[in-house]
UniProtKB/Swiss-Prot annotation:
Region span, Disordered: 337-368
Protein name, entry field: Phosphate acyltransferase
Biased composition regions of type Low complexity, renumbered to the chain: 349-368
Cross-referenced InterPro entries: FA_synthesis, Phospholipid_synth_PlsX-like
One of the protein's GO biological processes: fatty acid biosynthetic process
Recorded GO MF terms: phosphate:acyl-[acyl carrier protein] acyltransferase activity
Main enzyme class: transferase
Primary localization class, coarse: cytoplasm
Reactions catalysed, as given in the entry: a fatty acyl-[ACP] + phosphate = an acyl phosphate + holo-[ACP]
NCBIfam families, per the entry: plsX
Gene that specifies this protein: plsX
Localization (cell): Cytoplasm
Length: 368
C-alpha cells in the first residue's frame, strides 16, 4: 500500500528550507511513501532543484498561493487565506487524495482550520494535541500540548476519553489509567476548572487515578495525563530545554581538560546513547486527536531532522491504522458526558450537539 501524505511546505519558522529537504530524505528511505508538497511552487521547486529531486516520482508539487504566517490570527487563516498551503493540504486529505497532513504551521490556525475542514469525531467538541512522552517502562500519553489554551471542565473530560481510546487502541489495554495534571495530588488543590474536571472524571467510567504532578510525567505513574494546552505546551518545552541543557553541560564538562577528553573517548558509546535518548528532535510530531482524519503537528522551530520525524509519525499512523483503531476504541469505550456531568452534580457545561461545526473562535486556540 502506498502511503500518501500532504506536507504543508510553507509552515513553521523556516518553511521550504526545512520541510522540502526533510520530505526528500524521507521518500528516499521509504519507497512506499508518496508526498504531496503543498505551497508556493517556485519556492518548492528551488529546494527540489538544489537537492536534485525535481524528477522524483514520489514527490508531487501542489501549488498554493497563500501562506499562514506564524503570527497570523486564527480569523485570517480561517476566513481570508483560503488558498493557503495549510488549507490546501487539509483539503486534499478531506477529498481522499491523501491519508494524513503534516504541518509545522501556527498551532491555533492549524487547529481551527483542521476542525473546520475535516470536522471532529462525534462527541468531541475540540481536537487536542497528543503525544507519547518516554518513561522508564514505555511511554505516557499526554494531552493537550498546545491546541487549546483555555479549557472548560468537559473539554478535559473529552481529552481523557480520547487519550483512553488511543492507548486502548495502540496498547490493547482495556482500562488505561488516567491522571489529571495539577499542582498537588489532593482533591482540594487546583483552580475551579481543575476541581470541576476532577469531579467529572471521578463520575465517569474511566480508570481515573486522581491528580498527578509535573514530576509524574516521566515516571510512568499513569498511562494518560490530561491538561489544558497552555500547561501542556509549557511542560513540553520546559522538558526539551532541560534535555538540551543537560547535553550541553555534559559536553562542556568532558571538554574541560585533556584527562576529561580521554574519559569522554572511553565513555563515548554511553554518551552517544544518552544523546540519542534525550534528543527532543526525534520526538517531534504530535497527533491532533479528535478529527475525522489524521493531522500531525510539528514544532514550528523544527529543523529538517526533526521535521522528518514528524513525517514519520504520520506515515506510521497510516500504516498502523491508528485513526480507524481510535474511532473503534472510542465507540467501544465511549463516556457519556451528560451522565458524567449529572453524576458530578452538574459541574461543567453540556457540549454542543455533534455535527455542528461553525467556524471556530480564535479564543479557543493559539500559536505554539
Amino acid at each position: 500500500m502506498t502511503v500518501k501524505l500532504t506536507i504543508d511546505c510553507m509552515g513553521g519558522d523556516h518553511g521550504p528550507s526545512v520541510t522540502v529537504p526533510a520530505a526528500v530524505k524521507f521518500v528516499r528511505a521509504h519507497p512506499d511513501a508518496h508526498l504531496m508538497l503543498v505551497g508556493i511552487e517556485s519556492a518548492i521547486r528551488a529546494q527540489l532543484k538544489k537537492l536534485k529531486a525535481l524528477d522524483d516520482p514520489a514527490l508531487t508539487i501542489v501549488p498554493a498561493t497563500e501562506v499562514v504566517a506564524m503570527d497570523d490570527p486564527v480569523e485570517v487563516a480561517l476566513r481570508k487565506k483560503k488558498d493557503s498551503s495549510m488549507r490546501v493540504a487539509l483539503n486534499h486529505v478531506k477529498e481522499g487524495a491523501a491519508q494524513a497532513c503534516i504541518s509545522a504551521g501556527n498551532t491555533g490556525a492549524l487547529m481551527a482550520v483542521s476542525r473546520y475542514v475535516l470536522k471532529t469525531l462525534p462527541g468531541i467538541e475540540r481536537p487536542a494535541i497528543a503525544f507519547a512522552l518516554p518513561n522508564p517502562t514505555g511511554y505516557t500519553m499526554m494531552l493537550d500540548l498546545g491546541a487549546n489554551v483555555d479549557c472548560e471542565p468537559q473539554h478535559l473530560l473529552q481529552f481523557a476519553e480520547m487519550g483512553h481510546a488511543l492507548v486502548a487502541a495502540l496498547e490493547g489495554k482495556e482500562r488505561p489509567t488516567i491522571g489529571l495534571l495539577n499542582i498537588g495530588e489532593e482533591v482540594i488543590k487546583g483552580n475551579e476548572t481543575i476541581k470541576r474536571a476532577g469531579e467529572l472524571l471521578r463520575a465517569s467510567t474511566l480508570n481515573f487515578r486522581g491528580n498527578v504532578e509535573g514530576n509524574d510525567i516521566y515516571k510512568g505513574t499513569v498511562d494518560v495525563i490530561v491538561c489544558d494546552g497552555f500547561v501542556g505546551n509549557v511542560a513540553l518545552k520546559t522538558s526539551e530545554g532541560l534535555a538540551q541543557m543537560l547535553s550541553d553541560i555534559i559536553r562542556e564538562e568532558f571538554g574541560r581538560s585533556l584527562m576529561s577528553k580521554l574519559m569522554a573517548l572511553l565513555a563515548l558509546p554511553v554518551l552517544m546513547r544518552f544523546k540519542k535518548r534525550v534528543d527532543h528532535r526525534q520526538y517531534n510530531g504530535a497527533a491532533l486527536l479528535g478529527l475525522k482524519s489524521l493531522v500531525i503537528k510539528s514544532h514550528g522551530s523544527a529543523d529538517a531532522y526533526a521535521f522528518e520525524w514528524a513525517i514519520k509519525r504520520g506515515y506510521d499512523a497510516v500504516k498502523n491504522g491508528v485513526l480507524e483503531r481510535l474511532a473503534r476504541a472510542m465507540a467501544d469505550n465511549s463516556v457519556s458526558l451528560g451522565e458524567g456531568e449529572h453524576n458530578a452534580g452538574g459541574a461543567g457545561h453540556a457540549s454542543p450537539a455533534a455535527g455542528h461545526h461553525a467556524e471556530p473562535s480564535a479564543a479557543q486556540s493559539s500559536k505554539a
